[in-house]
Amino acid sequence: MAFSPANSFLINKSICESKEVEPLEANLFGKLHNKLLICKAKKENLEKKLAYQMMYSKLLKSLPKLSSLEENKLTKLKAPIEDMENTKKELEEIRKQSTETELRYLKSLSNTLSFGTLSLSNEINKVGPSASFMLKEVHDSVQVLEQRLEKMGLIEKPSESSESSIYSILASLKHTNDSLQKKELSPHEIAESPSSHSTSPMGRNVDTETLSFLLIDWQRLCAEQNTFLRDITNNMSSSVPQDVLSQLRQFFFRSELLSDKLSNLCSES
């Protein structure tokens, strides 16, 4: 046997995790990865919800002045934007939580890769012809890790070395770990386009019937969203079911269609 069972599992797990392939056994990485998926799903949903609320608010302002008899209907139509400020706060918090979770995940991955590389160096003489293949796999794993950190702005300058030697890999991992130690997380501000708060009049008046239909769509989507996110939360300790992810994708797709419908109404003149 070229590798001891412990070292072989550790190295393969490092490669597996860095390439985002689901590990066969439940472990810390699996739990962190599931939590990260949940954070990202919630973040994406809140971003869509806030975009919807801002667009809906803009449409609501374009309504013609209603008579006193229609005030009850107007109150009902305002329901989708009643918690808009709470949505903003919740989105800011989930963005921070998502970033922190991903950082913990990547730190754990970096430590595992470092230990796996050291384990590999201890048994390199036993590997023979497959040594170069294993080193290339670990090197590629480190590059994937660096790319993810670069996207998060948590690494100053990724390694450009194409050398897959033990020394080169350990040097890259040291650079990665040093960068992770230096960086401090800061809360993410919600990026809003200037047009989202525009008070300019709409090109056309939107009737209450149109908004009523949109409100029905909104309520249905919210009910589905709560069901899907609850399903994900209940499965945190295991792999996230593919059918749940598929349902989430369908929800997000329908949400995008609804956003497009709102955008078209806003752009019509």
UniProtKB/Swiss-Prot annotation:
Residue numbers spanned by region Disordered: 181-203
Coiled coil regions in record: none
Biased composition (Basic and acidic residues): 181-191
Gene Ontology BP, a term: mitotic cytokinesis
Biased composition (Polar residues): 193-202
Signal peptide stretch: none
Modified residues (Phosphoserine): S200
Keyword Phosphoprotein listed: yes
GO cellular component: cell cortex of cell tip; cell division site
Protein name, as recorded: Uncharacterized protein C16E8.08
Protein source organism: Schizosaccharomyces pombe (strain 972 / ATCC 24843)
